[in-house]
Amino acid sequence: MPSLRTRREEAEMELSAPGPSPWTPAAQAHVSDAPAVTHPGSAACGTPCCSDTELEAICPHYQQPDCDTRTEDKEFLHKEDIHEDLESQAEISENYAGDVLQVPELGDLCDDVSERDWGVPEGRRLPQSLSQEGDFTPAAMGLLRGPLGEKDLDCNGFDSRFSLSPNLMACQEIPTEERPHPYDMGGQSFQHSVDLTGHEGVPTAESPLICNECGKTFQGNPDLIQCQIVHTGEASFMCDDCGKTFSQNSVLKNHHRSHMSEKAYQCSECGKAFRGHSDFSRHQSHHSSERPYMCNECGKAFSQNSSLKKHQKSHMSEKPYECNECGKAFRRSSNLIQHQRIHSGEKPYVCSECGKAFRRSSNLIKHHRTHTGEKPFECGECGKAFSQSAHLRKHQRVHTGEKPYECNDCGKPFSRVSNLIKHHRVHTGEKPYKCSDCGKAFSQSSSLIQHRRIHTGEKPHVCNICGKAFSYSSVLRKHQIIHTGEKPYRCSVCGKAFSHSSALIQHQGVHTGDKPYACHECGKTFGRSSNLILHQRVHTGEKPYECTECGKTFSQSSTLIQHQRIHNGLKPHECNQCGKAFNRSSNLIHHQKVHTGEKPYTCVECGKGFSQSSHLIQHQIIHTGERPYKCSECGKAFSQRSVLIQHQRIHTGVKPYDCAACGKAFSQRSKLIKHQLIHTRE
């Protein structure tokens, strides 16, 4: 069975084909013999009724010179033209029997063929004249033809032409006496100004089509009309589900997907599903490393052009969207909407697992991964997976060494902006996080959380080797190295090995002499920030750590721990040479130098060596004459803090050293030792 061909192809074949015309006398005789039932009131031209007449009977009707249905600018020279005009969008097969074309009865076409088969868009209905037996005019056929691309549609009994079927429908539904008078445009009339504009704007090479509302130019008449529909508010395509109207059929089809629960497009990377293919394609670009769209201002690259356009607004000073509550302005309306939820407290996105609510849907999606354990973002270098793409990007800087965030004060670079913000507080001295129990302030929230464990006594981190518990995970990790004996960090200058990188960094300051942390009170410098913090308590007198046994307070937690061993008698650090035990690891280290004879600390003034750095520091005061420790009672100054403490007992009368033999008390331990000799001689 031959397929339907376009009008141009048929015409070219007829003009070029040799032999007699297919419009033969036999065909004309057959047409003239066909029964012709006329429309009521149309006896003058004998318009045949579509329900009782085959196509051949309409051929002479189309060629009546005075027929109302014959348009001024459309003539049908061949029966193929009539056939195509009537059925251009219907899938109807043609059977050639000699020179006569057989088609289904047109009444069947009127009544039985579905609106969708005729190309009528979803949400529109055929006019009354097409849904029952009645006028099946060329104009009605134009209505069926229009939505699928034909350019010119004719209105029955009204010499007008339209480019969109909705405008033709509107024309047909107006009574003849109410139709407007023809504009002076060759006798053609239009119901809407947009139709007149569409009629006037036949494009030529010299004059493109211009929209009178916005000045936009078009090369095609349908594009101009679609633009003008936006301005006039005319919406021709209606959704059957919600009644919403649209100016374009393609937009209606996209809208229909919002009523569908099924999401047909699923991402193979992360499993997220989408209703529309365009949304699915945009999402997939997030997984791709390709970022072809680059900002000319800052060089930042994006996977989507829309993301680039949004980013470029960040370089613009204009922020047209302002919050009515606080006056903060935003470049995007979506950002303003999200911001306003801070004031309203609205959190519309609720987790179905735990009930936690979020202001943004993106935060809910990220949170869901804590329940599912999903980590869709994997590092190509080491294979480590992350639940968020932002975490992956931060991690990748470990491999690249990139540190894009630089401190304006000292020039120190950082891989994360959060680390830069924390570092800035070193320069500003800002400590925004305050303990509600003791009032102590911290520069980082994590430091406050760790500090609060002093008050609560919480030690959530337990060593699985010895069962010892710690308040901080970092301290547990350091402790576990005691069991392994591992010291992977070695000094390149002296070869000394350390179990922690921080200890190595601090040690290297011995060789470089670098002491970047200075005390604002006395100017003393330190190689470690922690030592500076401890030193500053000398000036403030702060002693936040209190012994629960005797009430004694200490400036350092480590000193408190060491002190508590006096009460419990615990001496966990034992010398493997002589078996002597100590309550402090530092005392054991100092003691072991007795066996080795090691004195690594040498005075640069006199060359004297010492086994402990503290002894060297105390010795150097002899050369400098410095006496930094002053008694608050009498003003007397001392070179050593321990001597000051002993001196203060003169004023307080404290005698902490008791003789076990006679009970006599002494203010100094050395005096107790001398006294005990009296009993041993006896």
Curated annotation (Swiss-Prot):
GO cellular component labels: nucleolus; nucleoplasm; nucleus
Swiss-Prot/TrEMBL GO biological process terms: cell division; cellular response to sodium dodecyl sulfate; negative regulation of apoptotic process; positive regulation of cell cycle phase transition; positive regulation of cell division; positive regulation of cell population proliferation; positive regulation of erythrocyte differentiation; positive regulation of kinase activity
A Pfam family recorded for this sequence: zf-C2H2
Record keywords: Acetylation, Activator, Cell cycle, Cell division, DNA-binding, Isopeptide bond, Metal-binding, Mitogen, Nucleus, Repeat, Transcription, Transcription regulation, Ubl conjugation, Zinc, Zinc-finger
Ranges annotated as biased composition (Basic and acidic residues): 1-10, 113-125
C2H2-type zinc finger locations on the chain: 209-231, 237-259, 265-287, 293-315, 321-343, 349-371, 377-399, 405-427, 433-455, 461-483, 489-511, 517-539, 545-567, 573-595, 601-623, 629-651, 657-679
Crosslink feature (Glycyl lysine isopeptide (Lys-Gly) (interchain with G-Cter in SUMO2)) location: 253
Region Disordered: start-end pairs: 1-33, 112-134
Matching InterPro entries: Zinc_finger (IPR050331), Znf_C2H2_sf (IPR036236), Znf_C2H2_type (IPR013087)
A single MF term (Gene Ontology): DNA-binding transcription activator activity, RNA polymerase II-specific
Signal peptide residues on this chain, from the entry's feature table: none
Subcellular location: Nucleus
Annotated segments matching region Required for nuclear localization: 268-393, 341-373, 473-503
Family membership: Belongs to the krueppel C2H2-type zinc-finger protein family.
Role, per record: Acts as a transcriptional activator. Promotes cell proliferation by facilitating the cell cycle phase transition from the S to G2/M phase. Involved in both the hemin- and phorbol myristate acetate (PMA)-induced erythroid and megakaryocytic differentiation, respectively. Also plays a role as an inhibitor of cell apoptosis.
Name by which UniProt lists this protein: Zinc finger protein 16
Organism: Gorilla gorilla gorilla
Protein encoded by which gene: ZNF16
